Amino acid sequence: MFIIKGEVSRKDLIREIEKAIKSDELGAFIGAGLSIPAGFCSWKELLREPAEEIGLDVEKESDLVNLAQYYSNSKKRTSIDDLIKGQFSQLVKPTENHKLLSQLPISTFWTTNYDKLIEKALENNMKKPYVKTKDEQLRGTNHNFDAIVYKLHGDVETPEDAVITRSDYEEFGYNKRKLFREVLEGDLLTKTFLFLGFSFEDPNFNYVIGRLRVLLDEKNTRKHYCIMKRVQDADEDYEYKKARQELQIEDLNRYGIFTYLVNKYDEITEILSTLVDRFRRKTIFISGSAYSYSAYSQKTGENFIHKLSFELSKNGYHIVNGYGKGVGEFVLNGVADYCLTHKSKINDFLTLMPFPQNSSLGIDLDKLYKENREQMIESCGIAIFLFGNKEAEDIASGVMDEYELSKKHGLVCLPIEYTGGASKEIYDQTTQEISDKNTISAIEQANKQCDGDIDMSVKNIVQAVKILNKEEF
């Protein structure tokens, strides 16, 4: 039980964020704190020299918005613009937290930051961001994008439109970005937000959540979550800061915002890594090829793959497959069978990435195969290995390559030993290397002897996948 009203446990935080992921309703709100590891020096440090230029001491100023206004008044707006461009154009390398956020199925990002770190992270993860910084960009669009990034305070490329001075805040919602508040209100009503690096001291944001609370009353506001660093014993004025933090957590709870406290910022990365890992484990890479089906007859081997793919789809997993000979077509059949029976879209359950068979226009097939395998595997969390033989190879080299890539990308490998070929080789290697009890349990479950009963084999493999998607974290 928590002393502070509005504080949540790590387990509850992850569970609620996963619910939002499952319903495709997760949004992220990114504040300046997330950019500090990338080189952002904090607003106080940013304004230290400007304050000295106008005869002030930043340490004696509690209102940095007013300080920015004084500097703008004294040195003209272009000086503020140069300050923004000089600081934020240097932030070019996304942090680990930005990278992890880009791997989650988040289609809506809001940020008060001027930098391009989240956009860059999305692009590096093969996603197209659509950045919106002004009202004209809010109207309907046919743009092909994977995520919208709303920049509440503007962008480094147009510093003259950035919100930083008192005058900028006064004009926000009236002369500039008139519609941004309404769009943010809509997203706060329909999505579950995770706030990271955000201080909740921004007047524009506080206006929006205050308006929603009044319109809906506290009982009907949607739940959102934030992660903050706990005030530490060694901090100056510890008792005062601790009391203030507790009061802030209780106050945020009025707006439906629940807080998880970390002792160090590295814990944020750990939480995001857990979320990414658990999300990826809902996507399963099936690796394999089969010129022959080991101890199975051809018909039984084909039915085994069909039934396994059907049951994985039935349990809500998405399958990725490279359409290897003797395996891919029956993976497709199994998923298609499920989707037709349950009136579902096959794209929601299956991604096929076949390998080109012949070179054209001088394409290097080996290079293309490697890139194809990388793209297949990097989005998955579990790899199931079936059979793995070819007409001229008892142990298919391509399946072994996929095993090495799976390890490189951190997938949990589930080789089915009794299907023979590369899968048996991978089983022998994996069981010698792993020490994680959960993974060992899953591999043992998947490889229980069933005396050729493919229905029982399929049941055991699906159960192994469920073990790897355990509730504990």
Curated annotation (Swiss-Prot):
Activity regulation annotation text: Activated by 3'cADPR. 3'cADPR activates the NADase function of ThsA by binding to the SLOG domain, which changes its tetramer organization, probably allowing NAD(+) to access the active site.
Entry annotated with the keyword Hydrolase: yes
Enzyme Commission numbers on file: 3.2.2.5
Domain of life: Bacteria
Reactions this protein catalyses: NAD(+) + H2O = ADP-D-ribose + nicotinamide + H(+)
One Pfam family of this chain: SIR2_2
Active site: H153
UniProt cross-references to InterPro entries, sorted A to Z: DHS-like_NAD/FAD-binding_dom, Ssirtuin_cat_dom, ThsA_STALD
Keyword hit for Nucleus: no
Binding site for NAD(+): D115, H153
GO biological process: defense response to virus
Keyword annotations: Antiviral defense, Hydrolase, NAD, Nucleotide-binding
Binding site residues for 3'cADPR: G288, S289, F355, R373, K390, G398, E402
Deacetylase sirtuin-type domain residues: 3-282
Enzyme class (EC, first level): hydrolase
Region annotation SLOG (STALD) domain: where it falls in the sequence: 283-473
GO MF annotations in UniProt: hydrolase activity; nucleotide binding
Family: Belongs to the soluble Thoeris ThsA family.
Complex formation: Homotetramer; with a core of two SIR2 dimers flanked by SLOG dimers at both sides. 3'cADPR binding is likely to induce changes in the orientation and position of the SLOG domains.
Job description of the protein: NAD(+) hydrolyzing component (NADase) of the Thoeris antiviral defense system, composed of ThsA and ThsB (maybe SEQ_0762). Has a low NADase activity that is strongly activated by 3' cyclic ADP-D-ribose (3'cADPR) and weakly activated by 2'cADPR. Upon activation binds and hydrolyzes NAD(+), leading to cell death and inhibition of phage replication.
Domain notes: Has an N-terminal sirtuin-like domain (SIR2, residues 1-282) and a C-terminal SLOG (STALD)-like domain (residues 283-473). Dimerizes via the SIR2 domain. The SIR2 domain probably has NAD(+) hydrolase activity. The SLOG domain binds 3'cADPR; binding alters the protein conformation, probably allowing NAD(+) to access the active site.
Protein name: NAD(+) hydrolase ThsA
Organism: Streptococcus equi subsp. equi (strain 4047)
Annotated gene: thsA
